[in-house]
Design a protein with these regions (language model features):
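Membrane-embedded transmembrane alpha-helical bundles that form the catalytic cores
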Residues: 1-461
Length: 462
């Protein structure tokens, strides 16, 4: 059940919130966990047992890692938990990639959210082992942490200690509901009115690589970069908004990544919660940047190899991860020179656009079906095809408005203008205008969805 589906927007969500707000506080966790499991089972009924098994094993191992247990026992339990969670992930996501050349394996449909709830479980077990957080004795609360429906399928990935207080007790006021509803609607509009509108351009171009021209290749790449941003950041906005309406505060997951000042800065702005997870639970345990230059570069490459594999079991994702790993390593090596000789003049003016170009070019590996298709696409981008065709010019004619709107929407311009306007208005007027905007965006998004323009979220496949 996708957040942007009619069944979620007009059936599940209203009914769930009516029940949730009417019941007493002591029953909210029970209803929320039941609603979360129903939400998951609606789309993945055969994989609900896998989620429940992950919850139960994580809870049992966390309980067994009590502080008074010996260090060796706790370490052994942590290893057991990591083997279980990573083994689960390998079995359903990577078995064909790692072992398909040796044995004939059935092709499994990837369970929704498995990459996300597995990482949540690992972070909990590691934090309990480090005694950063006490073991959760209440199975219901731990189950809710792993299965909480706003973040279950596509994140954000939130460390357990950040949600622990709200799992035990939370309050919800009118401001939470208002702000959460507004944030959810902004995310819905990003998804329905921008990401799904760009899907026609992206699908048309990427689905017919034989007809690629230089113009269509660039249109397809720019369109995909914007589609992916609005698709995933829109989901994150909806998740953050839903969490707020339920009494939870989720961290931001995007911060205008296409305004990056470097490749490293791009990844401090894109899928922030995933980058934070890899930094805390892989990069730092490997030694981070405290182990000398060569080991630091090794650590960075290992993290980016893991990041690529996390996204998917194919050589495209492996190379995509290594592509960004190499770029970040180069930045690490060249940083002392840049500090000694600050960028000035033409170099300073070119650095940002070059970094943006390199970041966007990485999406070719991310989107292409396989490596030969990626190679073909790269060749067409840089002159390995006719400059344009009638079809390419038609794409430009039909989609330039949404491309322009997307380019503006990928900057903080609209948010800044709205903030300045809101600061000049009385609170009552501001609230009324916000309500009108919510209703207008909801109506426009609903019309678009009812016209049959619904597209699945891109990150559902991860």
């Amino acid at each position: 059940m996708a957040f942007s589906s009619i069944s979620f927007l007009f059936y599940f969500l209203p009914l769930f919130f009516i029940i949730y707000y009417l019941i007493p506080a002591r029953a909210k966790n029970v209803v929320l966990l039941a609603g979360s499991l129903f939400f998951y089972a609606w789309g993945e009924p055969r994989w609900i047992l896998l989620l429940l098994a992950s919850i139960l094993v994580t809870w049992l191992l966390g309980r067994a890692m009590r502080p008074e247990a010996s260090a060796g026992r706790r370490r052994g339990l942590l290893i057991l938990g990591l083997v279980f969670q990573l083994g689960l992930l390998v079995a359903v996501k990577y078995a064909g990639f790692f072992f398909g050349a040796f044995i004939d394996l059935p092709k499994l449909h990837l369970p929704l959210g498995v990459s996300f709830y597995t990482f949540h479980a690992i972070s909990y077990l590691v934090d309990v082992y480090r005694q950063k957080t006490p073991p959760q004795k209440n199975l219901l609360r731990l189950g809710l942490y792993l299965a909480l429906f706003p973040k279950l399928v596509m994140g954000p990935i939130v460390p357990y200690h950040e949600l622990e207080p709200a799992l035990a007790q939370r309050t919800i006021d009118a401001q939470d509901v208002s702000d959460g509803c507004f944030r959810f609607t902004i995310g819905l509009a990003k998804k329905a009115l921008l990401a799904d509108a760009l899907a026609g351009l992206v699908t048309g171009i990427w689905g017919d690589l034989a007809s690629l021209t230089v113009l269509s290749a660039w249109l397809g790449l720019i369109g995909y970069a914007l589609q992916l941003y609005f698709d995933f950041s829109g989901y994150s906005d909806m998740a953050i908004g839903l969490g707020r309406m339920l009494g939870f505060r989720f961290p931001e997951n995007f911060r205008y990544p296409y305004l990056c000042s470097s490749i490293s800065d791009f990844w401090r702005r894109w899928h922030i919660s995933l980058g934070s997870w890899f930094k805390e639970y892989l990069y730092f345990p490997l030694g981070g940047s405290r182990t000398g230059t060569l080991r630091t570069l090794r650590n960075l490459l290992l993290v980016w190899l893991a990041t690529g594999l996390w996204h998917g079991a194919s050589w495209n994702y492996v190379l995509w991860g290594l592509y960004f790993g190499v770029l970040i390593c180069l930045e690490k090596l060249l940083a002392p020179r840049f500090r000694a000789h600050p960028r000035k003049g033409l170099l300073a003016g070119l650095y940002r656009p070059v970094c943006l170009l390199l970041a966007v070019l990485g999406w070719v590996l991310f989107r292409a079906e396989d490596l030969p298709a990626a190679g073909r696409y790269f060749a067409c981008l840089f002159g390995g095809a006719a400059v344009a065709s009638a079809q390419a010019r038609l794409y430009l004619h039909d989609f330039w408005p949404v491309l322009l709107l997307g380019a503006v929407g990928a900057t903080p311009l609209c948010a800044k203008l709205a903030g300045r306007l809101g600061a000049k208005l009385q609170p009552g007027v501001r609230a009324a205008l916000q309500a009108v905007l919510v209703l207008a965006l909801l109506a426009c998004s609903t019309v678009w969805l009812l016209n049959g323009s619904f597209q699945s979220f891109v990150y559902f496949q991860f």
